[in-house]
Amino acid sequence: MKREYPESPLVGVGAVIVDRRDRDETRVVLIRRGTAPLLGEWSLPGGVLECGETLRAAVVREAREETGLLVESVEMLGVYERLIPGDQGRMRYHFVLIDFLCRPVGGELRAGSDAADVRWFTRDELPALNLAYDANDVVLKGLASAY
């Protein structure tokens, strides 16, 4: 199924990868998108579900592909829609996204797949990023409920 100008919505997953080192230091991984939509913007690692793949398996796979980290899916944080209009009244992108709180359990942080960059951010650094759509809300929710 094509992502741009799809015939029906695509189901995707997002990984809110939180590392809680101690009570005072909690950080989250974000990627700088290397492809459309939202090219060049900071966002959650994630992508489209593959046929036959569970949601939790998809979030683990996408996290590994885009960040180099092996993660454990802890809990579902929410379901979100991302609609990006195109030309002539058509929907250019339409995603239904299921975001999960994830804990890093291995691997090395590195940008991969369609990520142009990847890094850890603290809560204090988030406002300056101008995160895409509802990503800021789900990141804050993940930071608040981390383990």
Where are these regions (language model features)?
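A generic structural micro-feature
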Residues: Y5-P9, E41, R90-V96, A115
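Nudix hydrolase/Nudix homology domain
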Residues: E108-Y147
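Short, solvent-exposed loop/turn segments that connect beta-strands within catalytic domains
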Residues: R21-T26, L38, Q88-M91
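Conserved beta-strand segments that form the floor/walls of ligand-binding pockets within enzyme
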Residues: G12, S43, E75, D99-L101
